[in-house]
From Swiss-Prot:
GO BP of this protein: L-histidine catabolic process to glutamate and formamide; L-histidine catabolic process to glutamate and formate
Organism: Pseudomonas putida (strain GB-1)
The protein, known as: Imidazolonepropionase
A Pfam family the protein falls into: Amidohydro_1
Cofactor note text: Binds 1 zinc or iron ion per subunit.
InterPro entries registered for this protein in UniProt: Amidohydro-rel, HutI, Metal-dep_hydrolase_composite, Metal_Hydrolase
Entry's family note: Belongs to the metallo-dependent hydrolases superfamily. HutI family.
A single GO molecular function term of this UniProt record: iron ion binding
Amino acid sequence: MRTLWQHCHVATMAEGRYSAIEDAAIVTSAGLIEWIGPRAELAPVEADRTVDLGGAWVTPGLIDCHTHAVFGGNRSGEFEQRLQGVSYAEIAAQGGGIASTVRATRAASEDELFASARQRVQALMRDGVTTIEIKSGYGLDLANERKMLRVARRLADELPLAVRATCLAAHALPPEYAGRADDYIAHICDEMLPALAAEGLVDAVDAFCEHLAFSPAQVERLFIKARALGLPVKLHAEQLSSLHGSSLAARYQALSADHLEFMTEEDAIAMAKAGTVAVLLPGAFYFLRETQLPPMDALRRHGVKIALASDLNPGTSPGLSLRLMLNMGCTCFRMTPEEALAGVTVHAATALGLGDSHGSLEVGKVADFVAWQIERPADLAYWLGGDLPKRVVRKGHEISN
């Protein structure tokens, strides 16, 4: 069906800028953008449907390119403990932290995980999200990592949403491998990853490169295996210290390196040369009350593409609003509203390997967009919370009004 969408203004986000078109029109057909531009330049078109957008601003559908949306349990009790002065180490010694989420995730059925994840993902969708990445990493064995990734695939099947599934088995050491990180990495490489990839459950491979997780050498073994399986890689890097994980990610042409508060200028140069996207996660920065800012000037100076994401997870960023992350990117990390919007559209798409099909409003790309009743695009980063009036369009079909 061919649809004409008109009486709108468009922030196309092509090349990471607003690239605004006022008094615009969009023609969609077969789920793709067939034409976009000033309405005055549109030749007569035979449309099956014409939609008046009432002067709305249209942006690409928002993309949350880093989430841990599938998990069992709840860690709000730990939040209370931390605010009362209990340290993370003390909480972990009590069996809390990521270990508690692993236990709860392992104990939950696939249906239970699906039901809880669906609620969280639908909250993000209400913010205009049309594409999401979901990581595993709370199962830490083959059966439970498979269970998490199957839930990610089910969410894609049952919701009007594009989902990319990332295997993050190298998130933490499972209790059965305590003190044997090398053995666990070997288990992932030799058994878990080949099996999950063969089942079609994995779009990318991620790891947590940090003193309390896995070393650069261990991560590199995982990257070599991912490359052999034809899978792109991503990396949690430089969140708490500098191990130059982001440079390692760049050497393997990673889609992205994420967090990056402690990255160096040399890391930024390596990422720029490799085309690796910097995914910033202000929700975790805020929730953990961190003080080390990502090196924004170095990222800009060397032309690294910068994305933003929710990092939705139960321990360090229980954030259900990607629009809130736009504001946090501006207020915490000193991004401009234009940079922030690019970070949840065109650059987020690149961070998922979807840059050719998603993230900007251009002819031939997927017709995922949101029509917002706002005065200017910066409003999306300005307003804190609330449900801005909007229409959400996925593959040319309206899914929310």
